[in-house]
Each structure stands twice: as structure tokens, then as C-alpha cells.
From Swiss-Prot:
Protein family: Belongs to the FKBP-type PPIase family. Tig subfamily.
A GO term, aspect molecular function: peptidyl-prolyl cis-trans isomerase activity
Organism, as annotated: Bradyrhizobium sp. (strain BTAi1 / ATCC BAA-1182)
Listed Pfam families: FKBP_C (PF00254), Trigger_C (PF05698), Trigger_N (PF05697)
Listed EC numbers: 5.2.1.8
UniProtKB keywords: Cell cycle, Cell division, Chaperone, Cytoplasm, Isomerase, Rotamase
Localization terms from the record: Cytoplasm
The name this protein goes by in its record: Trigger factor
Reported function: Involved in protein export. Acts as a chaperone by maintaining the newly synthesized protein in an open conformation. Functions as a peptidyl-prolyl cis-trans isomerase.
Recorded superkingdom: Bacteria
Length: 452
């Protein structure tokens, strides 16, 4: 066997490989000898079929299998000897001319092919003990707890019928019957009876609720609205519609008193128990926000300290995933790049930079995990599947079966677990200091989150 490197540019390598016909023929003959004891051919006793006869019948198919296995074994040897860590699947180019292929399959010609591959660069890891990471922490105040309970009370408030002749106001709940049309034609899903609409809740399409202000019981109005351009039903998105709407009842919200009795309606012993429950929930939310901030800061530090050329094909793959998502979202919403105060060229440049960062960070985290023997156990993955199933009540078995039969989906669950374990490993070594911040500062949006 002869191996010649024909290309070595950065992370890209290409080799021309030549395997003598005699070597292939010997391997194929060995397969045929093994096959002799397994096949049944009329006129021959089991195990007594001459190899030469088998070669006439199965020779080309066995040679094809031999070539396939030889290429895989040879490529593995080439990459192992050179210490390559592959970034992509090897791209093998075989002879295509029919006459040449026939000679190779017949054992009359050497096999010559090329294999191109892109490799992962050698990564020198930083000393994580030199990392300083700020951990923002916000205190949960009594006002935060009271605000959370008020939101809960508002969501559970009851309504009482308004006085006869009273008109609907913002905040009222109006029971309506409606029939929607587009250009005078009714459409699927456009009809409803006994539907409760809380004016100002913004749960219906824009303009629908506002036009109910001032309506009375028994009154019919024609509400003129436009479906949003990003409406889920593409057949309705962006279209003008009219809803012939009749109010059958109008109710006003009753003030919900937050006391022990309210807590009992939620299955709790007292208001104090409710406050403790809400404080615990807020603690979970605050801790999660802190975790995200710390993780983002750590990833920024890893980005700063690990600058290298990432495999172009991986960057292209990551960019294409993001760009296709961006384009689909913009097409759905009807927005243009001008609406975002940018151009398509600038947006592409920005997302390619993000793709490069994501690929590099992925390689760095993988290198850290590999060198420190960080793994994800089957139990950890199973717990993640169980949590996902619990988040979809009534569909638990469907979710469980989906992940059991879908290795790719299971890998997508495993990846964030692995990433978090690597992050925790680094944080154990880094110098992490707490910083008191306000709730608003802790939960503020970070414009750069998409780069994480």
C-alpha cells in the first residue's frame, strides 16, 4: 500500500492511496473461504463448494465489500499514525470510469482513491486557576414575594356580572359569539361561541379586544382586524379580516383579597405558607439567572483565552443552521434587514463571527472534558428524559418512546448536560466572587446572549 499526501493547507489534508490488486484479491479470497461453510448451492455438499466456483458467483460483491472495509481500515490507519482528530467525515473519491471499476472488482487492477479530511487543531488549554469570574447575586425582597403573589391572585381572580345596561371597559371579561370572514368568505377556525375575552389581556389578535370597549350585552359589532404577519397559520398571516361579534355577557373583575382564605383555595394552610412557597420559587428563578450570567462570563473568558483557527466546514455548518433560522423567522414576520437597522451582508458577517465563536468554544469544552475524563452517565440522560416527559403531562410515554428510538434526539439532551459539567469543573478551579446586584440588573436582557 502506498500513501501520498497531496494537500496540507491549514486544517485541510488530502491523501492519494494505492492498494495493490494482489492485496485486495487475497482479502477477498479469505472472505470467500469463510463464505464456503455458510452458503448452500445445488449440486454441492455443505462446505464443499470450491472457492473458484464461489468466486464466479459472488466474486464482485465480495470484492466490493473488501474494498469498502479496506478503505475504512486504511483511512483509520492514516489518521491514527498522524494523530489526526477529525472535524468532518472523510470525503473519499473513487474511480468512476466503468472499465476501470470493472478491472478493480475483478482483481485485475490496483485500487487508487483519494481521501480528503478536515482536522481539529491542537488546542492549548488555559490555566483555569487564573480565571476570575463575577457571580451576580440579587436578594429576594418582601416586595418581590408580594408582587409574585399579586400576579397569582390576578390570574385566579373571579368575575361578577355588571349591572344591567353597563358597557364593557378595559379589564372586563366579555363573553362573545363571533364569525370571521376574509373578503366575505368564512375561514377555518374563525367561528366561536361562548368565548371569554378579557379586554386588555392581549390574548387575541391585535385590535380585537380594544373594539369591544363600550359594547353592551346583546349588541353586535363588526370588528375589523389584521392578522399579524408572523401569525402561525400562514393562510391567515398578514390578511385583513372582519369578525361579526355579539356580546352575550359582560363581567367585571372582583378584587382578590390576599389572605389565609386565598391561600387555602390554592391548597395551602395559610398566607405565610404561600409566601414561603413563592419565595422558594423565586429563589429558583434567581439562581437560574445567576447561573446563566456566570456561565456567560466564563464562556467569554474561554473565548478570550482560546484563539485559534476552527475547521471551516464546522463554521459553515453552524452558520448555515443559524442563518436558515434567521431567514425563516424574518420571512414569517415579514421583517427586512432594514427594519433591524442593518444589511444582509452585515448580518451575515455578524452571524459568521458568532458561528466561529460557538465552534471554538465547543471544541475547547470538548477538549477540557476529554482531558479531565468528564462524562455523562446513562442515569443523567435518563433523568433528563424523565424531566422532559414530566413537562408534557399526558404524553409521558410518547416522549419516553421518542427518545428511546431516536439516538440523535438523545444526543441533543446529552450535550447540554456535558457542557454544564465541564463548566462546573472550570468554576471549581476559577476564582469566583459574588457581587450584589438588583433584581432588574440580574434579569436584564443581554444583547450578546445569542453568541453564547
Amino acid at each position: 500500500m502506498q500513501v501520498t499526501e497531496t494537500l496540507s493547507e491549514g486544517l485541510k489534508h488530502e491523501f492519494q492511496v494505492s492498494v495493490p490488486a494482489a492485496d485486495l484479491d487475497a482479502k477477498a479470497d479469505a472472505k470467500l473461504v469463510d463464505l464456503k461453510d455458510k452458503v448452500r448451492i445445488n449440486g454441492f455438499r455443505p462446505g464443499k463448494v470450491p472457492v473458484a466456483h464461489l468466486k464466479k458467483i459472488y466474486g464482485k460483491s465480495v470484492m466490493a465489500e473488501t474494498i469498502d472495509q479496506t478503505i475504512r481500515d486504511t483511512n483509520t490507519q492514516i489518521f491514527t499514525e498522524r494523530g489526526f482528530r477529525l472535524a468532518t467525515e472523510p470525503k473519499v473519491t473513487m474511480p468512476t470510469e466503468e472499465a476501470e471499476v470493472e478491472k478493480i472488482l475483478s482483481g485485475q487492477s490496483d485500487l487508487t482513491y483519494t481521501v480528503a479530511v478536515e482536522v481539529v487543531p491542537a488546542i492549548t488549554l488555559a490555566d483555569f486557576k487564573t480565571f476570575s469570574v463575577e457571580k451576580p447575586v440579587a436578594d429576594i425582597t418582601d416586595a418581590d414575594v408580594d408582587e409574585a403573589i399579586k400576579r397569582l391572585a390576578d390570574a385566579n381572580r373571579s368575575y361578577a356580572a355588571k349591572a344591567e345596561g353597563a358597557k364593557a371597559e378595559s379589564g372586563d371579561r366579555v363573553k362573545v359569539n363571533f364569525k370571521g370572514t376574509i373578503d366575505g368568505v368564512a375561514f377555518d377556525g374563525g367561528t366561536g361561541e361562548g368565548i371569554d375575552v378579557v379586554i386588555g389581556s392581549n390574548t387575541f389578535i391585535p385590535g380585537f379586544e380594544d373594539q369591544l370597549i363600550g359594547i353592551g350585552v346583546g349588541e353586535t359589532r363588526t370588528l375589523k382586524v389584521a392578522f399579524p404577519k408572523n401569525y402561525l397559520n400562514n393562510d391567515l398571516a398578514g390578511k385583513d379580516a372582519e369578525f361579526e361579534t355579539t356580546a352575550t355577557a359582560i363581567e367585571t373583575p372582583e378584587e382578590k383579597v390576599v389572605d389565609d382564605e386565598f391561600a387555602k383555595t390554592l391548597g395551602l394552610e395559610s398566607l405565610d405558607k404561600l409566601k414561603q412557597l413563592m419565595r422558594d420559587r423565586l429563589a429558583g428563578e434567581f439562581n437560574q439567572a445567576t447561573r446563566q450570567r456566570v456561565k456567560r462570563a466564563l464562556l467569554d473568558r474561554l473565548d478570550e483565552t482560546h484563539k485559534f483557527d476552527a475547521p471551516p466546514s464546522l463554521i459553515d455548518e453552524e452558520f448555515n443552521l443559524m442563518w436558515n433560522s434567521v431567514k425563516a423567522e424574518m420571512d414569517s414576520s415579514g421583517k427586512t434587514f432594514a427594519d433591524e437597522n442593518t444589511t444582509e451582508e452585515k448580518a451575515k458577517e455578524e452571524y459568521r463571527t458568532i458561528a466561529d465563536r460557538r465552534v471554538r468554544l465547543g471544541l475547547v469544552l470538548s477538549e477540557i472534558g476529554e482531558k479531565n475524563k468528564i462524562t455523562v452517565t446513562d442515569d443523567e440522560v435518563s433523568r433528563a428524559v424523565i424531566e422532559r416527559a414530566r413537562s408534557m403531562p399526558g404524553r409521558e410515554k410518547e416522549v419516553w418512546d421518542f427518545y428511546r428510538s431516536n439516538p440523535q434526539a438523545l444526543a441533543q439532551l446529552r450535550a447540554p448536560i456535558y457542557e454544564d459539567k465541564v463548566v462546573d469543573f472550570i468554576l471549581e478551579l476559577a476564582n469566583v466572587t459574588e457581587k450584589k446586584v438588583s433584581k432588574d440588573e440580574l434579569f436584564k436582557d443581554d444583547e450578546n446572549d445569542k453568541a453564547a
